[in-house]
């Protein structure tokens, strides 16, 4: 079977517009499933309507990335396949995406990245490096070498752009982070300034950064499972070609941007019929991150270690679905600051999206950087629940115990760990200090130096993992330790059954 390439799409007349002639207008940090199935897909829709007319240069965000070589192998082409239900109708539509001009590895081609960053054609920056990407890493500045962190790379790129273009018209950029971090634009800007200060950039750079550049707050919403591993051959047969970057996504999409009129004119999403809202972000952000992303993080470890592989399989499993719904409706929803009827309706819609039979959203993908995700997506709910009830949330803490068990590595894979579920193995990937904490903790359990209860107390005491010292609350430690003990001794299924049998609806938080 032929592989996706420029030659293939040309010979089959699959592209109806001259995308290869469009200038590079977007610098994008990240090239993973989400950006390809959301931002780059949106740019393609605008290009098709002749309202943006630009392409993306995708930058590999970490040294361990594997997408850029695949982009190069396929002439920067890939397919987005939208599958699901929209407005009561089945959507099953695929198209070749041509909005990426090239992918660059900054660790081997840093000067090429800087050259793109200084191009007058570049007007906007997008990023999605996960919550773990918007952090500060102590590192020096070397103009010949890419910084390791994303904010460091962006600071270096902006400095090079300023050095090259100065205060000329159009020298500044619109910077739109898509990471699920509250006030992500402000957070990223502060990190860039912190690097610039540490690297002794001159005051005039800070003035230019403030006056000519705009950092936007955003909220993104689309489930993008990415490559359909289990049905790839069947998909290739339907497509008529092989695509190693095939990206499956749901039809639903929502992009909320807090930005000026400058941003609206630069990115006329709405003119292309895209579901993009401007401003009024905070209410929807709180609801979406806690209900959708929070539930994903809540469910992934306990579901995967119960023997299922995807979100859809978990929702189709009676026991798991019951547990997930109880955790969502009894502990997460009551802590969302919005009218209960509105939140409940949104939650039911989210569960319908989880049940999408066309998607294979792998739980192990949700499990990447899971400790970071737990801290940002579930700890705010945990804190609110404790404040409202004075009690420790049973379902959330069981999920935390499942996460601790999920992070039990059996071998190392470079800087990361490999976990095992019976005959299956999975990658445990997170910040290096997170990996080290779990690796050392589980090694001490394996050698008899720590009991499971002591492991829990040790891990829960680490503020760098959870944002607070969870070991200060004895009942929190006891609940997590008890759940972990049962999970390890009797298995995840029996542990879940025990929680479901113990608890009725009496721990529901009632809003005032």
Curated annotation (Swiss-Prot):
Pathway: Carbohydrate metabolism; pentose and glucuronate interconversion. GO terms for biological process: D-galacturonate catabolic process; mannitol catabolic process. Its EC number is 1.1.1.58. Keywords: NAD, Oxidoreductase. GO terms for cellular component: cytosol. One of its GO terms (molecular function) is mannitol-1-phosphate 5-dehydrogenase activity. NAD(+) binds at residues 26-37. The keyword Oxidoreductase applies. Gene3D superfamilies: N-(1-d-carboxylethyl)-l-norvaline Dehydrogenase, domain 2 (1.10.1040.10), NAD(P)-binding Rossmann-like Domain (3.40.50.720). It catalyses: D-altronate + NAD(+) = keto-D-tagaturonate + NADH + H(+). InterPro entries: 6-PGluconate_DH-like_C_sf, 6PGD_dom2, Altronate_OxRdtase, Mannitol_DH_C, Mannitol_DH_N, NAD(P)-bd_dom_sf. Pfam families: Mannitol_dh, Mannitol_dh_C. Belongs to the mannitol dehydrogenase family. UxaB subfamily. NCBIfam families: PRK03643.1 (NF002969). This is Altronate oxidoreductase. It comes from Halalkalibacterium halodurans (strain ATCC BAA-125 / DSM 18197 / FERM 7344 / JCM 9153 / C-125).
């Amino acid at each position: 079977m032929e592989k996706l390439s420029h030659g293939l799409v040309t010979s089959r007349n699959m592209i109806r517009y001259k995308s290869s002639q469009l200038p590079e207008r977007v610098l994008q940090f990240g090239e993973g499933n989400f950006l390809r199935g959301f931002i780059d897909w949106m740019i393609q829709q605008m290009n098709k309507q002749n309202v943006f007319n630009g392409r993306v240069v995708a930058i590999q965000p970490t040294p361990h990335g594997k997408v850029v070589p695949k982009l190069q192998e396929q002439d920067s082409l890939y397919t987005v396949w939208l599958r699901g239900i929209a407005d009561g109708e089945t959507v099953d539509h695929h198209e070749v995406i041509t909005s990426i001009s090239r992918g660059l590895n900054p660790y081997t081609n840093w000067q090429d990245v800087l050259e793109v960053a200084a191009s007058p054609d570049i007007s906007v920056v997008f990023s999605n490096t996960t919550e773990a990407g918007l952090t500060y890493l102590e590192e020096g500045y070397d103009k010949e070498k890419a910084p390791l962190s994303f904010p460091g790379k962006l600071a270096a790129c902006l400095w090079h752009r300023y050095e090259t273009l100065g205060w000329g018209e159009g020298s500044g950029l619109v910077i739109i982070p898509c990471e699920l971090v509250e006030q992500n634009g402000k957070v990223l800007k502060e990190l860039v300034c912190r690097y610039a200060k540490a690297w002794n950039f001159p005051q005039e750079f800070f003035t230019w950064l403030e006056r000519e550049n705009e950092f936007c707050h955003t909220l993104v919403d689309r489930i993008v499972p990415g490559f359909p591993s289990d049905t790839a051959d069947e998909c290739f047969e339907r497509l008529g070609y092989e695509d190693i970057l095939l990206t499956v996504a749901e039809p639903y999409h929502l992009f909320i941007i807090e930005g000026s009129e400058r941003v609206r004119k630069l990115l006329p999403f709405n003119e292309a019929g895209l579901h993009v809202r401007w401003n009024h972000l905070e209410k929807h952000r709180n609801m979406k991150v806690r209900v959708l992303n929070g539930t994903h993080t809540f469910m992934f470890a306990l579901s995967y270690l119960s023997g299922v592989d995807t979100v859809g399989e978990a929702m189709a499993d009676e026991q798991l679905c019951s547990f997930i719904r109880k955790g969502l409706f009894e502990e997460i929803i009551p802590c969302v600051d919005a009218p209960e009827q509105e939140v409940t309706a949104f939650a039911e819609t989210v569960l319908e999206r989880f049940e999408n039979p066309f998607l294979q959203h792998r739980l192990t993908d949700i499990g990447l950087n899971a400790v970071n995700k737990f801290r940002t997506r579930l700890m705010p709910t945990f804190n609110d629940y404790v404040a409202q009830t004075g009690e420790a949330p049973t379902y959330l803490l069981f999920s935390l115990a499942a996460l601790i068990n999920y992070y039990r590595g059996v071998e190392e894979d470079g800087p990361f760990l490999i976990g095992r579920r019976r005959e299956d193995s999975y990658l445990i990937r997170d910040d290096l200090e997170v990996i080290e904490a779990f690796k050392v903790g589980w090694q001490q359990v394996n050698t008899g130096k720590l009991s499971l209860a002591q492991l829990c107390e040790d891990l829960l005491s680490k503020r760098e993992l959870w944002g607070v010292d969870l070991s200060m609350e004895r009942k929190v430690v006891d609940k997590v330790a008890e759940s972990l003990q049962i999970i390890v001794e009797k298995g995840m299924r029996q542990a879940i059954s025990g929680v479901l049998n113990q608890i009725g609806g009496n721990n529901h938080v009632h809003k005032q």
